[in-house]
Amino acid sequence: NWYSNSADYSDCLNTSTATIEFWGTLYNQIFTANNVIGTVDNETEDPTLQYYLAQALAVRAFDYFTLIQLYQFNYKGHESAMGMPLITEQNATEVAANGCARSTVQETYDFILADLNKAIELLTATTKERDDKRYVSLDVAYGIRARVYLAMHNYAEALKDAEAALAKTTATPYSRADVSKPSFINIEDNSWMWGILITEQDRVSTTGICNFPSHMGSLNYGYASVGGWRRISPKLYSEIPASDVRKGWFLNGEGVSANLPAAAQTYITGKKAPAYTQVKYGVLNDQW
């Protein structure tokens, strides 16, 4: 049961699966980022090293931002609450020997912003371009910082960074037609600014069910389609105007969505999906 840790509050224990997956994975990435940051001269003028240092700083910021949202309330009104243990390239050896006290929420967000500010500075200076969407480009760094400012309720700065991200990116939003059918699954689509290309040979694919499509894809085999359906409340569904394309991202009260191709509707009906099930995400090569 993927939800038992949360249901019995054991997800706060260091031995829980949830802790290993989230806390463990993110701090392992921070460990790697710290190694890069501690190796590269912070004031380097080498374009390649500037690029690598920016990657490490941006990823470390993203990881701490993810952690602080998982393990503490939002920023606004909780600035003095306990935040994350901030392990860096400067204190890693000391932490390994003696542990690390938690910083406050304010200190955690200050640290995140400092990393992002430096990453943006480096990505502005470097002439090296990414060759894969998995890497952080200047537009992505602005986008991450915009999200941080949103979490801090600093909407003016969030708007500035969102506009900067749009100005720097070559990505374009999905059209209404694009999202009027199950989609949001192809990293090659020009709407995606940042993400990892997953192949059929990757471990996350070969597991069959331990992946995002399994949990969120109602139109393919996985946890969702055998009973773990993701659903919207009837009340919220009724609030979505008929003219809003997002209404079709869910089955209606009769188990039908105007967004679904005939084969997809036949599939979801055959699976006896309950009313108001989410059908937003497509499947590989439209193999219903």
Predicted regions and their residues:
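Conserved, well-structured interaction surfaces
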Residues: W2-Y71, G99, S103, E121-T124, ...
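Start-of-helix signal in alpha-solenoid helical-repeat scaffolds, especially tetratricopeptide repeats
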Residues: G24-L26, A54, V59, E79, ...
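Short, flexible, mixed-charge acidic loops at enzyme active sites
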Residues: K76-A92
